[in-house]
Amino acid sequence: MAPTLAPFAARWDAEADRRMALRTPEHLKALMDAQKGYNSARSTAATAKSQRTAARAASKNPLSTVRRAARTADKAARTHRDQAKTKLKAARKDYPATLRARAVQAHAMHAVPGAGISALGWDQAGAWPVAGSLALIAANVAALVIGRRKVAVAVADELSAEERRLVERLDPSYWAQHADERGLVGTVTTPVQVTPAGLVTTVRLDGRWKPSAFKAKHEEIRALLGARTDLRMEIKAGSHGDRAVITLRTRSAADGIDLTGWTPGAPWGVDTVTGEPVQVPLGRRMLIAGTSGSGKSWSTRALLAEGSEYADHRLVVVDPKRVEAINWQHRARTAISIEDVLDVTDELVEEMHERLELIPRGQDVIQISPERPRITVFIDEGAEVIAMAKKTRAKGSKEEPGDPDWSRIMENLSTLARMARAAEIILIWATQKPTMDAKGGIDPQISAQITYRAALALSTSGESRVVFGEDATEKGWHAHELPMPGVAMLRSGPKVQPHPINTRAFSPADVIALPDRPVWRRQESPARSAGASAPAPLRLVKETAPAAEVPAQPTKAPTNREKVAAAIGTGATTVADVATVTGINKGSVSKAVKQLLDAGEVLRSEDGSLSVVTQVGEVSA
């Protein structure tokens, strides 16, 4: 009963204190002066009234001087009396009676008549009038006594100092006494439950409240609890329409779990609410966003290690910034320069089309194997790759073909996002700037195809909506409120809860220490490299050795420079001819030709034709 009656007792005491604060000697003196002035004004008004009556009786002429003077004096006396009465009321308001005196007067108004009725009409009325009055008096006193009780909140010893303070303020007795101060009157909490993820309490709402309106008061609730500004607080609808649930994330169910390093099959992270491991299955197109310093690179490396570990898996890393790509060169195909990025995306598209033709009837995905492995394509950073594709092409000349169409980079990646899942070519797109504007790091066509969406700490709620959808704010996907570094949210379906996840931390040194694994390249046959038109079937650089054995070194695939030299040796004399023979884009051919010219392995004649130097002083015909 104490929490229920606490607001009444608090208001009673507040009014009593207000009245006592006004009962000062100055206000008492003003009241006495006002009472004296009012008594004098009443006496004057009574005298003026009697004089007017006498003048009216003495003369029948209403316009006589005596009657007019008496009438004017009476009117002035009455006006003065009214003014004195107004001043008296103001003085009484400034020096009010005590609340106890008012309570006695109020109860006397019903107790005295009730006692008289009971005494005079006992046989007819019975004892109920006086009994009812006594019950009202007893209820008033009991409400004050119970409402003023200070309930001691039992707090578990294992709670931290912050949790103990929050538990005390979430207790119904404290909440009911202070809710009115924060505009939360009509709400009352239930005893707090301590869970592995923090403190949880259910709030009962009266008819003035809806869960959505209560949620909108999150600032007032935080102030009432005295909670830290950076403490994660969740408010949502309860099990019934008149209830809401407050959750304070003072704890993490992932505390004490070691998430450093990586081993095959290890979870990507641990749910801080449930404590369950979070697995990200291979073969899922994925978006990973996180502002600078959020731990995006450290959190992503475990996924890349898993995607390059097995015999039927290969990894491609596209990193224009170079920093991440160089760590994976011993177990992934890396593309750093714009020419390399265009080459690898061209190869991936060709590989995709070839695989799609191999899918048998009745199946929707190609079966992966060491010969046809799943290829995970990791894009880091998305904004840089998009900027690459917007680079202005250099115009060609008669001798130099100019730059290739760099916009083909994004065309290839969009094609892979739309069509390559069935070919087991999986795109993982990472960016620090998850926006879709001109300088953003997400392409709308690619984003539309992604089903797994992860975000570490972001800058704004708008970025959270871009990553998780337009309902992110409504459903609680507030990645912009996550702490840094290494805490993420993962939305992999409509029923997934927005729980923070402590992700695995994998350092660059850990990546470099990983064992070598086969590197994927779309290899061509010697006839194709020499100028034949028919493409050779896909061959991997090497096979994966058994797990118990050290993997064998891969057979080195011919480089673009070697292919260009071989094509020139077979009779190709211009850059355009070499590009046609080798299937390499013209920009990469021009780059390789320049390297061969600088090394003296190829000569350019006056008419611009190319030839290979076979021996000292000799040129191939």
Swiss-Prot record:
Residue ranges occupied by any FtsK domain in the UniProt entry: 275-465
A Gene Ontology cellular-component term: plasma membrane
Cited InterPro entries: FtsK/SpoIIIE/SftA, FtsK_dom, P-loop_NTPase
Gene3D superfamilies reported for this sequence: P-loop containing nucleotide triphosphate hydrolases (3.40.50.300)
Localization (cell): Cell membrane
Annotated function: Major protein required for plasmid transfer.
Name of protein: Protein Tra
Origin species: Streptomyces lividans
Lineage: Bacteria, Bacillati, Actinomycetota, Actinomycetes, Kitasatosporales
